[in-house]
Amino acid sequence: MIDELMVQQQVKSVWQHMVGVMCLNLTYRKQVKKLLPKLFKRYPNATAYIRGRYKTQEKMLRPLGMSTVRAKRIRLMSMDFLSWNRKDARALYGIGKYGNDSYRIFYKNE
């Protein structure tokens, strides 16, 4: 059970939660669990991520695979996040039903 909630244990904000959800897509939890603290130390929020160097982000995400795609998706989601109304997480780039359900459970108490 603890491992199942590992994303929630490592995040301090909704943005970090969404990044965690995106990183878990097609990736083992163990890999994501190692990477998130490093990623969030360097990029604690959407603004920091957007201002960061794309090549550095791509390199950091490389251990998860598909780093080019992940870096781009997280960047686009982060841009959406800054103007998001926080109603439906599917409005964010790259966040689907799983991410929206997770948001509703952990942040909207639905």
Language-model region placement:
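N-terminal polyanion-binding entry modules of DNA glycosylases/AP lyases
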Residues: 1-86
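Cytochrome P450
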Residues: 9-10, 93, 107-108
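Short, structured loop/turn "capping" segments at alpha-beta junctions
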Residues: 84-85, 99-102
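Cytochrome P450 C-terminal beta-domain/meander region
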Residues: 87-93
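Catalytic Zn2+-binding segment of zinc metalloproteases
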Residues: 101-110
